[in-house]
Amino acid sequence: MQGIEIEEDIDVQIDINVSSYIPDEYIESSTQKIEVYQDIALCKTEEDISEIIDEITDRYGNMPDEVNNLIEITRIKQMCKIANIIKVNQRRENVVFTFNEKEFNIDIVQKLLQKFRNQIKFSPGAVPYITYKIKNLSDTIKEIKEFLEECK
């Protein structure tokens, strides 16, 4: 029997200050709403996300900001998995990115410290994390995605 390595699917926790839900005015049926939430949760790739966006807009029309935010949070989760980040937690203008200590890469942190200088603080320890200061709260999702892009 050969040993087969099974990739662990990390459940990334996201707690940021944006409205992300499906409004009743957009999808009235609870059953359809649950189906859409499930479909969004099952997205694993950018292709999956594009397909679900097309499907939602075809069935229900242009997405309101709250649904767009829900989709963007799904993108953020995917980016976190690639960057080995297990948790994103926002408190006012600070966003804390907690790394998976099993897959932690100090080279990424050094790169981030050079790029974001006065905007981040690194806290080593049993569970390393970075605190990132958002410049503009109305661009929270955009700034988080830009930060995560640099974590590759």
Which ranges hold each PLM region?
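Accessory helical-bundle/CTD segments and flexible terminal tails appended to RecA-like ATPase motors
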Residues: 1-152
